[in-house]
């Protein structure tokens, strides 16, 4: 039976076996090319966007798309190397044709297709070599045909194959959900819908998981079994995808793909939203009775569209001359919402629709085009409007192009003269983490708190490393981390975010921006933000979530100093939220790990703090990746070593107190107090 122990054992085995390797890592986000992909048979790259298409309507054909060069799949001792791969795929039959066969993710000792057959053999084997132990082929099949000769369980299954199409394990395609991971939902493989798959092999066991694209990775794998691939994965192997057609045909598409020998979080780097859809529509227009009339209507429609375009161009030119359209609008985020529509959506920014406030802004719930949205209204005086507009442009230029499952999406924007600037976000039904910890009857349980920490780490990793330009958030705190309807955490409120070229280390400011208790010592002293100051804020957030205590509370020791003190006494677990202790449902090892991660991140020396990539790997695997190589390391040793923890009171004195911040000459008017989030947003 599946249990959390299974995940713990799998992660522990990964920790023990993931030594420093000469493996590779790559990410294809709808950017397949004939250069970065080896195309065989009927496989092609279709663009735009650049996706890998394995098959077409040709009967009895094979299509393969492989990484262009061999990779090392075993160590010097002949032990198979661990790997993690994730990809987004779509399978769909062609209109008016019966569906065909599936496809497989594969490791092959060769690239050519001469030793493979089409149809039910998926372009992997033929009638003679299927089952041959010398084939040295490993695959995970996604099949939509029930072949009795291979003992297929049904016509919609996922299977793990070793040298044979008779799977060593197979399950109906789908995922496990619910709070206990016991609710199974079947996913129809050949519906044309986009699905994401995760395949993780730690050297002795394999996990296979799938879900709808843009959904969170299910905690419980679809398939989780011990697996010995010694003698199967060789020194030099090809890796990629294969599919075939027979008398029956259908399309097999790979939209995105990531692979790594060392990073189990590689799947988080895939863009899962705004992908092309291949779902089948109704009957073909070519066979409809109104086809001829439709062509005539189409000509009329084309003329109408041309007329509308001309009207649009003239109107835009007039607006630009009148100063209503900013020069940057089209480039960064073209979806401007009319102010009158925003007024209607929020009922005139009524108090009953207000769900949050902070600084010079308020957040309202609204309904635009039938969908709930969160509307952030930033008020300003005429004197402030120029500077505020610049910050507004920074936010639009950042959020308008960022796409990640753990970042709140920007839906549009608006403004009213120099009085107010307006941002329209996705609505987060479950409000802020701040609210769910301190001001809500439905308090976050331990499992949900760990998920929130992992989600925020994933979102911050994307901001720091996952885009062409580094993005500094500059105000990470519990009220800026929001929860969607599925309780997934997302980073919100980019009002203080700055774009940073990767060639530069820091962004200088003339005053401190941030929130008391979350600001790194060097930020308070110099006003200079960096990725390390974001990491510090993340560390404070982790301590806050685990302890159920705000960073600064009147009459109490600051949370950072308090947890450092508990660490010195070897009682760090005593910092756990008393309400969680009373509930009794928590994992001591996870509590200890989370608090130590928090302490790593809030170290007063920014050079000692980990990068967000390292934080993500600690959370996923309990290990650190050092610059220049990977090695196992004890978190306890790292936190308690003399390198990290200076003895006596000297260490604590390096952390800024509330008074330090208040007395800072750079504090001025930019100091932010806690935002209050009353409801979901």
Curated annotation (Swiss-Prot):
Gene3D superfamilies: 2.60.120.200, Phosphorylase Kinase, domain 1, Transferase(Phosphotransferase) domain 1. One of its GO terms (molecular function) is protein serine/threonine kinase activity. Glycans are attached at residues 31, 42, 56, 72, 126, 202, 207, 228, 263. PROSITE patterns: PROTEIN_KINASE_ATP (PS00107), PROTEIN_KINASE_DOM (PS50011), PROTEIN_KINASE_ST (PS00108). It is a single-pass type I membrane protein. It catalyses: L-seryl-[protein] + ATP = O-phospho-L-seryl-[protein] + ADP + H(+); L-threonyl-[protein] + ATP = O-phospho-L-threonyl-[protein] + ADP + H(+). Residues 24-290 are extracellular. GO terms for cellular component: plasma membrane. The keyword DNA repair does not apply. Keywords: ATP-binding, Cell membrane, Glycoprotein, Kinase, Lectin, Membrane, Nucleotide-binding, Receptor, Serine/threonine-protein kinase, Signal, Transferase, Transmembrane, Transmembrane helix. Its main location: membrane. Residues 349-624 form the Protein kinase domain. The chain crosses the membrane at residues 291-311. ATP binds at residues 355-363, 376. This is Probable L-type lectin-domain containing receptor kinase VII.2. The gene is LECRK72.
């Amino acid at each position: 039976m599946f249990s959390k122990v299974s995940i713990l054992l799998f992660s522990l085995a990964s920790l023990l076996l993931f030594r420093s390797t000469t493996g590779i890592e790559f990410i294809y986000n709808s950017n397949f090319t004939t250069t970065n992909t080896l195309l065989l048979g009927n496989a092609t790259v279709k663009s735009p966007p650049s996706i890998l298409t394995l098959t077409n309507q040709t009967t009895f054909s094979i299509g393969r798309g492989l990484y262009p060069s061999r990779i090392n799949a075993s160590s010097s001792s002949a032990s198979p190397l661990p790997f993690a791969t994730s990809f987004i795929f779509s399978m769909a039959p062609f209109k008016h044709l019966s569906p065909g066969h599936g496809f497989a993710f594969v490791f092959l000792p060769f690239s050519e297709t001469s030793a493979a057959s089409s149809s039910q053999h998926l372009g992997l084997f033929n009638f003679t070599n299927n089952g041959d132990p010398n084939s040295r082929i490993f695959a995970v099949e996604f099949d939509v045909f029930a072949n009795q000769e291979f003992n297929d369980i049904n016509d919609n299954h996922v299977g793990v194959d070793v040298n044979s199409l008779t799977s060593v394990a197979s399950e109906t395609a789908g995922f496990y959900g619910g709070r206990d991971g016991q609710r199974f939902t079947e996913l129809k493989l050949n519906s044309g819908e986009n699905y994401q798959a995760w395949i993780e092999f730690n050297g002795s066991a394999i996990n296979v998981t799938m879900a709808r694209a843009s959904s969170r990775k299910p905690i419980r794998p679809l398939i989780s079994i011990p697996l010995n691939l010694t003698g199967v994965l060789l020194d030099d192997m090809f890796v990629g995808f294969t599919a075939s057609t027979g008398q029956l045909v259908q399309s097999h598409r790979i939209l995105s793909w990531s692979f790594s020998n060392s990073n189990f979080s590689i799947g988080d780097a895939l863009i899962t939203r705004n992908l092309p859809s291949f779902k089948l529509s109704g009957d073909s227009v070519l066979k409809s009775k109104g086809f001829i009339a439709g062509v005539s209507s189409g000509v009329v429609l084309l003329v109408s569209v041309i007329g509308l375009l001309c009207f649009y161009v003239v109107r835009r030119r007039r607006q630009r001359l009148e100063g209503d359209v900013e020069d940057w609008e089209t480039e960064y985020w073209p979806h401007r919402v009319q102010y009158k529509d925003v007024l209607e959506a929020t009922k005139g920014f009524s108090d009953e629709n207000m769900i949050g406030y902070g600084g010079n802004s308020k957040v309202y719930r609204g309904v635009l085009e039938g969908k709930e949205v969160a509307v952030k209204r930033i008020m300003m005086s005429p004197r402030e409007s120029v500077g505020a507009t610049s910050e507004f442009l920074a936010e639009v230029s950042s959020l308008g192009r960022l796409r990640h499952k753990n970042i709140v999406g920007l839906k549009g924007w608006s403004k009213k003269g120099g009085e107010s600037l307006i941002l329209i976000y996705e609505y987060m039904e479950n409000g802020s983490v701040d609210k769910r910890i301190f001001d809500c009857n439905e308090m976050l349980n331990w499992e949900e708190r760990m998920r929130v920490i992992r989600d925020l780490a994933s979102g911050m990793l994307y901001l720091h490393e996952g885009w062409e330009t580094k993005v500094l958030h500059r105000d990470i705190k519990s009220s800026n981390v929001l929860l969607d309807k599925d309780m997934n955490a997302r980073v919100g409120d980019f009002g203080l975010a700055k774009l940073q070229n990767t060639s530069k280390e820091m962004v200088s400011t003339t005053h401190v921006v941030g929130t008391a208790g979350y600001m790194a010592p060097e930020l308070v002293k110099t006003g200079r933000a960096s990725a390390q100051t974001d990491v510090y804020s993340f560390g404070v957030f982790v301590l806050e979530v685990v302890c159920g205590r705000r960073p600064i509370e009147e009459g109490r020791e600051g949370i950072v100093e308090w947890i450092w003190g508990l660490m010195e006494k070897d009682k760090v677990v005593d910092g756990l939220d008393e309400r969680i202790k009373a509930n009794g449902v928590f994992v001591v090892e996870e509590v200890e790990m989370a608090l130590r991660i928090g302490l790593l991140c809030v170290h007063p020396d920014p050079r000692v703090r980990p990068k967000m990539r390292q934080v993500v790997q600690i959370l996923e695997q309990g290990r650190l990746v050092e610059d220049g190589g990977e090695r196992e390391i004890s978190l306890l040793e790292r936190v308690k070593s003399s390198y990290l923890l200076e003895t006596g009171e000297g260490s604590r004195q390096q952390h800024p107190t509330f008074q330090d911040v208040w007395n800072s000459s750079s504090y001025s008017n930019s100091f932010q107090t806690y935002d209050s989030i009353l409801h979901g947003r």
